[in-house]
Amino acid sequence: MKYEDIRRQVLTAIRQASAQGLIHGTSGNISVRDREAGVAAITPSGRPYDTMEPGDIAIVTLEGEWVDGPYAPSSEPPMHTAVYRARPDVGAVVHNHALFCTVMAMAVDELPPSTPPQAEFAPIRVVPFAVPGSRALAASVAAALGTDGLAVLLRNHGSLCCGAAAYVEEAAQVAYYASALGRFTPLGEADIRACKEMLAAGRAV
């Protein structure tokens, strides 16, 4: 089987995301890049994740062209591959419709971190709604991530992460509940920088 390693990585990641409650049914999509081959493995469209096999995972070029696999890729290769083209450092992309990210994407223009582990993802910007799978959505996501961003929220849609998606959903959940209680206190800029430095040095926060 061609591209077996990245296909298996995608399958493992999508099952973990499903177990964490970040993905339901066949919603959401995950991709992993093969830098040497210049392709990415991405979840296929409409296939149940619990019965999926590595060979079911679609392969696309970094321009989004489907080149291998028995099932068509998710509708979102333009968004995934736009991130890969803009960010050579990114090796995997997770897009989901997790509840709290989706809710907060409709309520705020930026989601600030409120705990040390969330600092790694700051700032988490919110991009305007665009039709899923469109070039407009792909372009706005790549622009919002910039040169070092790790996550964005998609208004009326969900989120996209280049890292541990569970922390982004946690950030949205904490912000939602704290706001509901009447006082949401995010980390300050100096604290965010300090936490990022600790994380970059491999120190747990």
Task: List each model region and its residues.
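Glycine-rich flexible loops
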Residues: 1-205
